């Protein structure tokens, strides 16, 4: 499919099939509540609040489809499909469910507090002509590279490093091409980089942190409590 075949719509893909092992949960991480609301619901609410997303596709384990439909906002905009064993499998399922999309956002459900304004910045850059855009924050800690024995082998220049967040935005044809190449990468932007395509950055937001550990979960709950008190 090329750009002439799409309808120009922005479709957000939300992989939500990963397990909550590091959170000490048996359910998929996306279904773990933060302040009483599942992460995936918070993430979807943020995408809707941004006002720049036309459709949202949430990919969940087959046995969690009914639960996901029940907890997500009733809307023609939001659709739940079966995801895969790996994150890349889930994204592929999302791509297949939106054949007419013009742009894709791939957003971690675990980044449940991502501000709508950040989502708007990503879509704004895509609409302005960028083909791949990711939110990023400067790295504040010193980073060391180490060998297999844990011995330091180098210290990268921190000024050139960025911590990348989601949603990551792409033109539909570019993201489809990246997944068709079937090469290993730790995120969607990494797949695009393997094609030799430039990936642009916009200012990220500390609130778009990924809820991965019990400490992250406590922080997110505290932030939600403070938001509710305002």
From Swiss-Prot:
Entry protein name: 2-C-methyl-D-erythritol 4-phosphate cytidylyltransferase
This protein's UniProt keywords: Isoprene biosynthesis, Nucleotidyltransferase, Transferase
Site (Positions MEP for the nucleophilic attack): 158, 210
Function: Catalyzes the formation of 4-diphosphocytidyl-2-C-methyl-D-erythritol from CTP and 2-C-methyl-D-erythritol 4-phosphate (MEP).
GO biological process, one term: isopentenyl diphosphate biosynthetic process, methylerythritol 4-phosphate pathway
One MF term in the entry's GO annotations: 2-C-methyl-D-erythritol 4-phosphate cytidylyltransferase activity
HAMAP family with a match to the protein in the record: IspD
EC number: 2.7.7.60
Taxonomic path: Bacteria, Bacillati, Actinomycetota, Actinomycetes, Mycobacteriales
Annotated metabolic or biological route of this protein: Isoprenoid biosynthesis; isopentenyl diphosphate biosynthesis via DXP pathway; isopentenyl diphosphate from 1-deoxy-D-xylulose 5-phosphate: step 2/6
Domain of life: Bacteria
Enzyme class: transferase
Record-annotated site: Transition state stabilizer: 22, 29
Catalysed reaction equations from the record: 2-C-methyl-D-erythritol 4-phosphate + CTP + H(+) = 4-CDP-2-C-methyl-D-erythritol + diphosphate
PANTHER family noted in UniProt: 2-C-METHYL-D-ERYTHRITOL 4-PHOSPHATE CYTIDYLYLTRANSFERASE, CHLOROPLASTIC
Organism: Nocardia farcinica (strain IFM 10152)
Entry similarity comment: Belongs to the IspD/TarI cytidylyltransferase family. IspD subfamily.
